[in-house]
């Protein structure tokens, strides 16, 4: 039987030092858990949490795009690393937050890091959040964005024909 105690991530020396500092700050936060807050209070707390740590944003070209697919209108934020052309590898990014929390500003650093480190274009899906949007709106928008991106990969990828 293994009797070793798990190491708390905020104290684990194998966890990157900035991440440990962030986790320690998170663990020391006072107040009720997010799930006990109203949607507005939870969103405000999430924004405050994300903006409480300093952020070095990798340079990127940012484009906001609204697309129509399968009868739905979906807002996208396209993050292209500097030097990356329009045609090329791309990935879709669906943020977490239980379809209620999060948006591009609260995920921008992470999305830019992924795009910069991979050299790929990120297509951030700004799906409608609950409770304002009823189930399954966000899932349908995510699927429509996926189909839009997939259809774009079949295009000629010339001129303005970019997914």
Model-predicted segments: where are they?
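A glycine/proline-hinged amphipathic helix-loop "lid/cap" segment
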Residues: 1-81
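Alpha/beta-hydrolase active-site loop
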Residues: 133-155, 161-163
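Short helix-loop-beta connector
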Residues: 85-86, 157-159
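Short beta-to-alpha linker loops that shape the active-site pocket of alpha/beta-hydrolase fold enzymes
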Residues: 126-130
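Short beta-strand element of the alpha/beta-hydrolase
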Residues: 87-97
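Short amphipathic alpha-helix adjacent to the substrate-entry channel of hydrolases
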Residues: 105-125, 140
């Amino acid at each position: 039987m293994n009797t070793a105690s798990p190491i708390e991530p905020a104290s684990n020396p194998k966890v990157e030092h900035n991440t440990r500092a962030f986790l320690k700050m998170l663990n020391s936060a006072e107040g009720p858990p997010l799930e006990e807050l109203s949607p507005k209070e939870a969103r405000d707390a999430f924004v405050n949490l994300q903006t409480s740590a300093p952020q070095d944003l990798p340079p990127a070209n940012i484009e906001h795009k609204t697309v129509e697919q399968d009868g739905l209108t979906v807002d996208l934020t396209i993050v292209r690393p500097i030097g990356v052309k329009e045609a090329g590898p791309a990935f879709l990014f669906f943020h977490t937050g239980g379809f209620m929390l999060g948006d591009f500003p609260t995920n921008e650093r992470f999305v830019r890091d992924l795009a910069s480190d991979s050299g790929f274009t990120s297509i951030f899906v700004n799906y409608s959040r609950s409770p304002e949007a009823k189930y399954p709106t966000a899932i349908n928008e995510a699927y429509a964005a996926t189909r839009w991106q997939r259809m774009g990969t079949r295009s000629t990828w010339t001129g303005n024909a970019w997914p």
